[in-house]
Amino acid sequence: MDLPGPIHDIFLVFLGSGLILGGLGVVLLTNPVYSAFSLGLVLVCISLFHIPSNSYFVAAAQLLIYVGAINVLIVFAVMFMNGSEYYNYFHLWTVGDGVTSLICTSILFSLIKTILDTSWYGIIWTTRSNQIIEQDLISNVQQIGIHLSTDFYLPFELISIILLVALVGAIAMARQE
């Protein structure tokens, strides 16, 4: 998708704000069903980030796999939980929540510092894939595999971390019976 500069920037700002709002919804909403729907918004926004870079197959695959299967499974699992027991034992703030918030905030800021200090263009897997594809000796499936393991390595790692955190949160909520 070849968009003009301002439209491309507006599209990325829209997706980024959707990611931030969805992430805040996952964490801050007390109703687990609404939290699961916010996770769906986050996964949709992450998959739509692949469209400006002309990787429509990756975007469609992420929509089908993560939103279409995983998030629906999480929504059904959350709906089968007994909601009244969850809300009876809900405490506003505990010491463990404060310690967890402090640890997560420090990890977040260390990740932000690491991401900002890293020279992403000097990493070998971002420049090597173009040399391989220029040979024209490989099929489309091999090109997708090369792009997934080189250019789109970071987005897939990020989505796997988000999915892992969501599943751990769903298990933690289910165990609070």
Curated annotation (Swiss-Prot):
It catalyses: a plastoquinone + NADH + (n+1) H(+)(in) = a plastoquinol + NAD(+) + n H(+)(out); a plastoquinone + NADPH + (n+1) H(+)(in) = a plastoquinol + NADP(+) + n H(+)(out). GO terms for cellular component: chloroplast thylakoid membrane. Its EC number is 7.1.1.-. The chain crosses the membrane at residues 10-30, 32-52, 61-81, 92-112, 152-172. It is found in: Plastid, Chloroplast thylakoid membrane. It is an enzyme of class 7 (translocase). The keyword Translocase applies. It is a multi-pass membrane protein. Coiled coil: none annotated. Belongs to the complex I subunit 6 family. NDH shuttles electrons from NAD(P)H:plastoquinone, via FMN and iron-sulfur (Fe-S) centers, to quinones in the photosynthetic chain and possibly in a chloroplast respiratory chain. The immediate electron acceptor for the enzyme in this species is believed to be plastoquinone. Couples the redox reaction to proton translocation, and thus conserves the redox energy in a proton gradient. NDH is composed of at least 16 different subunits, 5 of which are encoded in the nucleus. This is NAD(P)H-quinone oxidoreductase subunit 6, chloroplastic.
